[in-house]
Amino acid sequence: MIQQESRLRVADNTGAREILCIRVLGGSTRRFAGIGDVIVATVKEATPGGNVKAGDIVKAVIVRAKKETRRPDGSYIRFDENAAVLIRNDNEPRGTRIFGPVARELRDKKFMKIVSLAPEVL
């Protein structure tokens, strides 16, 4: 469960290391975001020479969350960290590589490029 001021690790090679959520997209009263939801964030920590710099405003999709997510078969999935992948306005990833596993829920939310780039889909 991600909300405003939540910090997330970036799971791609855009050059950002950590982002801070400043808005959950999907309505003015929407407070929380889970796996597969899109947020607006600011880059808090970045590697030198990357595509994004610290202070940039970016859109990101959540690929891993500590809060468990219930699946239709009754099972739950949760991860050890909160992580996101930076995306462009057309919902395509900005980076060319994805690090770490991603949740299967991204396939249902039409983020097929992220699913295909990920090394493991849980």
Curated annotation (Swiss-Prot):
GO MF annotations, alphabetized: large ribosomal subunit rRNA binding; structural constituent of ribosome
One GO biological process term: translation
Classification via Gene3D superfamilies: Ribosomal protein L14
GO CC entries: cytosolic large ribosomal subunit
Matches recorded under Pfam families: Ribosomal_L14
Record flagged with keyword RNA-binding: yes
Annotated keywords: Ribonucleoprotein, Ribosomal protein, RNA-binding, rRNA-binding
Role of this protein: Binds to 23S rRNA. Forms part of two intersubunit bridges in the 70S ribosome.
Family (UniProt): Belongs to the universal ribosomal protein uL14 family.
Subunit and interaction comment: Part of the 50S ribosomal subunit. Forms a cluster with proteins L3 and L19. In the 70S ribosome, L14 and L19 interact and together make contacts with the 16S rRNA in bridges B5 and B8.
Name of this chain's protein: Large ribosomal subunit protein uL14
Gene name tied to this protein: rplN
